[in-house]
């Protein structure tokens, strides 16, 4: 099992349809995205299976091809939040043992003085030469337990900590999302308003699996008016947004675009009053998720219909356990615990 199979299958079904857009501009069809990813994968094999390949960039279309190329090469995708200080990035690169880091021109220039890892600039001549390599065969025998994504969280000690996510983990996340939250198809779009290093990027696999186009805002960041404009021009739009981003959409005073279908919110507290204002402005498009680095996007949540006529206690909660997930509160001895005092939460799933 290798996550590249999601792109492989979609390219076979929808090869000539648009796959990746930069704003409203078509960058790749599914067939051309597959070929470019396999060409990149061929060049990345020099680092060997299991090599950690980092990406540090503002949102840009190449992140999608890099993600699948890294998986096709049976390497590990290590995305870095582009908002981090370069010394924090270097700490992650060192901790991960990254063999290479692909960066935007801006981040590459800032990172170069402190990085001990080799830097390549996305879109530069060296990068494009990689994309001209002979295509690698699609992977067929990847161990599903092998790592696919090294997800760095803020941690509790002031130093980022990496959660190792396998191909099986991310496939389970993909199936869970499609079972519980959204039903995209080839006439749908995923708008990458939030950083692709985290929640928005984690949603690439489920939407690619259904042939939904990947839309990267031309600004490379979150601008509420640009986001809403993209939801007017692309079909069947879904997105992952932080609660603060949802609030900024409401502040525009604009009506809900006709093509906006789903906003999954998470990654921070959504206050009940803020959620009610968002629902009044945009209607029943909201889905809530609660997860963590070790169980990305996959612990609890509220579906769109769970928000309808729900009491404040439900709207202010983290929702219900997701399909295939068992959530419990345990005491120090691991037994079920009825008091919040000295308790810890436990999550189990079919990973």
Feature locations, PLM:
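ANL superfamily adenylate-forming
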Residues: 106-145, 159
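Conserved AMP-binding/adenylation subdomain of ANL enzymes
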Residues: 171-189, 199-237, 252
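Conserved structural elements of the adenylate-forming
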Residues: 33-39, 144, 163-185, 193, ...
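AMP-dependent adenylate-forming
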Residues: 6-29
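Conserved AMP-binding/adenylate-forming
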Residues: 26, 41-84
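Conserved pre-ATP/AMP-binding loop-to-beta segment of ANL
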Residues: 15-16, 134-152, 159, 183-189, ...
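Gly/Ser/Thr-rich phosphate-binding loop
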Residues: 212, 236-240, 250-312, 326, ...
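ANL superfamily AMP-binding
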Residues: 17, 31-54, 84-86, 90, ...
């Amino acid at each position: 099992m290798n996550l590249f199979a999601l792109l492989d299958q979609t390219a076979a079904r929808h090869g000539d349809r648009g796959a990746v857009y930069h704003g409203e501009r078509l960058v790749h069809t599914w067939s051309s995205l597959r070929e470019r990813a396999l060409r990149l994968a061929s060049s990345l094999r020099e680092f060997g299976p299991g090599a950690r390949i980092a990406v540090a960039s503002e949102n840009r279309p190449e992140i999608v091809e890099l993600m699948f190329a890294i998986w096709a090469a049976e390497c590990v995708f290590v995305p870095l939040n582009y908002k981090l200080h370069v010394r924090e990035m270097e700490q992650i690169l060192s901790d991960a043992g990254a063999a290479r880091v692909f960066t935007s021109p801006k981040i590459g220039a800032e990172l170069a003085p402190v990085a001990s890892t080799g830097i390549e600039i996305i879109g530069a001549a060296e990068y494009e030469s990689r994309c001209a390599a002979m295509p690698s065969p699609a992977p067929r025998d990847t161990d599903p337990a092998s790592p696919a994504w090294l997800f760095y969280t803020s941690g509790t000690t002031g130093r980022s900590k990496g959660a190792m996510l396998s191909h099986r983990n991310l496939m389970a996340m993909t199936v869970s999302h499609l079972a519980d939250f959204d039903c995209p198809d080839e006439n749908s779009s995923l708008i990458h308003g939030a950083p692709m290093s985290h929640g928005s990027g984690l949603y690439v696999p489920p939407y690619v699996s259904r042939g939904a186009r990947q839309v990267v805002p031309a600004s490379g960041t979150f601008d509420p008016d640009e986001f809403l404009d993209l939801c007017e021009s692309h079909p069947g739009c879904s997105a992952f947004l932080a609660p603060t981003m949802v609030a900024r959409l409401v502040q525009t005073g604009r009506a809900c675009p006709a093509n906006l279908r789903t906003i999954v919110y998470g990654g921070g507290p959504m206050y009940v009053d803020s959620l009610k204002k968002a629902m009044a402005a945009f209607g029943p498009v909201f889905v809530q998720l609660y997860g963590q680095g070790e169980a990305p996007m996959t612990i609890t949540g509220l579906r769109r219909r769970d928000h309808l006529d729900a009491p404040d206690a439900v709207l202010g909660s983290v929702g219900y356990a997701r399909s295939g997930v068992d959530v419990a509160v345990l005491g120090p001895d691991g037994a079920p615990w009825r008091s919040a005092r000295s308790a810890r939460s436990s999550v189990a799933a079919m990973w």
